[in-house]
Amino acid sequence: MAAPLLEKLSESLGSPEPAIRLILSVLVGYPFALVYRWFLFYQPATVVHLFHICSGLALAAFNFGSQLYHSAVCVFVQFLMLRLMGRTVTGVLSSFTFQMLYLLAGYYYTATEEYDIKWTMPHCVLTLKLIGLAFDFYDGGKEPSQLSADQAKAALPSVPTLLEVFGFSYFYGGFLVGPQFTMRNYQKLVSRELTDCPGKPPNSVVPALKRFALGFLCLAMYAIFSPSFPDTYLLTDEYEAQPFWYRCVFILLWGKFMLYKYVSCWVIAEGVCILAGLGYNGVVNGKHQWDACANMKVWLFETTPLFGGTIASFNINTNAWAARHVFKRLKFLGNKTLSHVATLLFLTIWHGLHSGYILCFSMEFFIITVERQAQALVLDSPLLTSLANSHFYPFVYIVQQFIHWLFMGYPLVPFCLFTYDKWLKVYSSVYFCGHLFFLVAYLILPFLRITLVPKKDRREKKQD
């Protein structure tokens, strides 16, 4: 009965059926959260775990059918490794190796040349959860002084039970599209600690509805505008025949609206977590915070003229996971740049095996490097600082935003088109303008520094 209805809905909306199933599965998290609040909040932990497991498995079955066994196998193996290997480096390395190899094998055997919603999509979220679980269990055996603040907060004092591991993995608010959260936070949710009124369900309905409304607005924008900017048009002769400026503006608008696909899912899923209580983040300046599961800072995403600002506003929990479990654990390298490169390399492999991911993340690293040098130049140059603080700044801001979104869309081309032949065709059609722009900027910034920064300031900077 459901299949024909979904088929008709898919046809009427002009969206693939797997995408319809996915968004419905994210939305059904709201009634699941209400069931938990109304009927299960005061129930024993075992009942809550079973509810999370059954609801998550139901979502997996609805979207991927019998392929849900992939997640079940990985969760069970992870539990066995925690139990049998204990708090050891071997346990962490075994978990990391097994979970990543399973994910990469999934990518390899299900790979196509287009973006498909298949079991590997939620599995990449699960992979980070389970690797993070191994790290957090290992950290629980260390002295707090050996850990960073966020690592100490997530460290597990004891091995979790089988029900805890499965409930944590299949929690309906984060199983399909994230966000990432720790086992400690999940345990606090089940023990009724994540609430603004102790002993009662949290007053989180209004904050959850606000995120739902914002997410739905982003989803509507994606549904309205994305059909006008399809990925496939980038590969057509018609696109190649357009003027250069048109091709660039198309990439700008395409990249902007394409990202709403991710923004909408993450913000709606965040609302589910808030409604259940998992989004509770304590009190700051007398106000209860509900941003523990925030994966997007939408206002910053929309208004920042900086590439670094967009990265800071986008996929926040995944970036925080990478910082906590990869970047900060590479201190032994003694070089932040090397740690940054290694972290980006991990995220590249985690996303998939296509060449487009490598190019996208390498471009991100290069763009951020150039932007930081440009920011330092503006801060050190009296002329540029005065210009940035003058009445001309609104004009400068508009130019910044154009450059920012043009070259945000530019590295997204290989990210979305995946294969060498496709992204090379698009980059050739715009004469590799993004590569050339940032290469030229990288080469001339040292000379601009000599020209625009007083010698005294340059000497002081060198000494620092």
Regions found by a protein language model. Give the residues of each.
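Non-catalytic, membrane-anchoring transmembrane segments at the edges
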Residues: M1-D464
